[in-house]
Amino acid sequence: GYTEENGYLKLVYYDWTDPIESNITRLMAKIDEVKNATGASQVDLIGHSMGGLVARAYVQSDGYLARDDVAHLITLGSPHLGASKAYPTWEAATLYETLPEEYHQLAILWNFIARKNTDILFELRSMIPSIQDLLPTADYLDLGQLVTGYLYDDTENDALIPEAHMVHQNDYLTDLYMGVSSL
């Protein structure tokens, strides 16, 4: 790993509730901080999960073209095609399946409140707009706790729900994917 003797490591925190695009500015500031501290003209980025999407979005952004300050980009566990569990949360404020087990009681209460208050969906989308950036960009199959990468509609002979038929689309990741040749 990195040590002071053989390299420079800087952790970059981001607000996971903010849209990916909003986190790019924070990443750029940290890159500038590292370049100023080390004298390097380029940095290596390693991003996990949504952090990988933030790093990728930066490298594919117009702002990056003028800077060209990333030598290598590595993403680990980043949902480049979206995340199946984001869809029920964004579409219906359903949180049970998306939370760790220790929060299931809270999620049950949340789901009860969501059924009683239609404004809860508006509130969720306002408080955590990043969920929209994580919506699936392909057909998904979700069998409860057994997520296989596809949304699944078991009411129609076990047919997949095509991404095109989902009420909400993820234009952000789709557009990012269209620019993948810039990587």
Residue ranges of predicted features:
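Active-site catalytic motif of lipid deacylating hydrolases and related acyltransferases
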Residues: 1-41
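Extracytoplasmic/secreted cell-surface and envelope-processing proteins
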Residues: 20, 54-55, 82-85
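Short, hydrophobic alpha-helix immediately C-terminal to the catalytic nucleophile
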Residues: 25-28, 56-60
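Short beta-strand immediately N-terminal to the catalytic nucleophile in serine-hydrolase-like folds
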Residues: 42-47, 76
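Gly/Ala-rich beta-loop-alpha elbow adjacent to hydrolase catalytic centers
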Residues: 46-47, 51, 55
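Helical cap/lid subdomain of alpha/beta-hydrolase-fold lipid enzymes
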Residues: 60-183
